UniProtKB/Swiss-Prot annotation:
Involved in DNA repair and RecF pathway recombination. InterPro entries: ARFGAP/RecO (IPR037278), DNA_rep/recomb_RecO_N (IPR022572), NA-bd_OB-fold (IPR012340), RecO (IPR003717), RecO_C (IPR042242). It comes from Vibrio vulnificus (strain YJ016). Pfam families: RecO_C (PF02565), RecO_N (PF11967). This is DNA repair protein RecO. The keyword DNA damage applies. It comes from the Bacteria. GO terms for biological process: DNA recombination; double-strand break repair.
Length: 243
């Protein structure tokens, strides 16, 4: 994919040191999707980019190069970084890791970029991050072509009944079921997932179950680092509350 002619709206998903003064950036761009950039000299004392090339800071970036790793040529922060703290910060790190693990390099996804920006904005303001996370996971699955009909029974084609139980079958959809287990959902839960609107705790938990099932093949067996960090954060907090 050719390099852009002008500045592009981007977010840094992850950054790591390279050599004595440079950075390698995993970037999510509006028009080019995920790209890898080298920012030469970004860690030097004289660099004015040192504080700008951070996750959750809206950026305008320009780069050059044709290989897998491009060279950053220009960077301008659009605004200050989004105010993310505590559990909401760990939730945003999870979103970044999810994009980095699931999306292929250099596949344009402008719609998902807007969903990502909306998710970060929600997380910066939310008391409970769970609804924003579920909405983004569902948007990510849709962007990758993971099409699921939440509103019709895959066996009969009839509209989903809010009171009935349905079993999820991968690549088929939801089939009416009389048993309840981890792969079954109430009709009202499926309707809530379709509308991305979660009015009850049960609907939110059902959405989390579904996205875990759907994302598992993309994530493989490797655990998410952000989830491990979140668990480590919760353990000291729980112990202090017990004291």
């Amino acid at each position: 994919m050719n390099a852009p002619d002008g500045l592009q709206r981007c977010f840094v998903l992850h950054r790591r040191p390279y050599s004595e003064s440079s950075l390698i950036l995993d970037v999510f761009s509006e028009e080019f999707g995920r790209i890898t950039l080298m920012s030469k000299g970004a860690r030097s004392k004289r660099s004015n980019l040192k504080g700008a090339l951070q996750p959750f800071t809206p950026l305008l970036l320009k780069w050059s190069g044709k290989g897998a790793m491009k060279t950053l040529r220009q960077a301008e922060p659009i605004s200050l970084g989004l105010p993310l703290t505590g559990i909401n910060l760990y939730s945003a790190l999870y979103v970044n890791e999810l994009i980095g693990r699931v999306l292929m390099q250099e596949v344009p996804m402008p719609g998902l970029f807007h969903d990502y920006l909306f998710a970060l904005t929600e997380l910066a303001q939310a008391d409970n991050p769970e609804p924003a996370l579920r909405r983004f996971e569902l948007a990510l699955l849709a962007a990758m072509g993971y099409g699921v009909d939440f509103l019709h029974c895959a066996g009969t084609g009839e509209p989903i009944d809010p009171q009935m139980t349905y079993r999820y079958r991968e690549q088929k959809g939801f089939i009416a079921s009389v048993r309840r287990d981890n792969l079954t959902f109430l009709g009202n839960e499926l309707i809530a997932i379709s509308e991305r609107r979660f009015l009850t705790k049960e609907q939110l938990q059902a959405a989390k179950r579904f996205t875990r099932i759907a994302l598992k093949p993309y994530l493989g067996g490797k655990p998410l680092k952000s989830r491990e960090l979140f668990i480590q954060m919760r353990i000291p907090r729980t112990r202090s509350m017990e004291k």
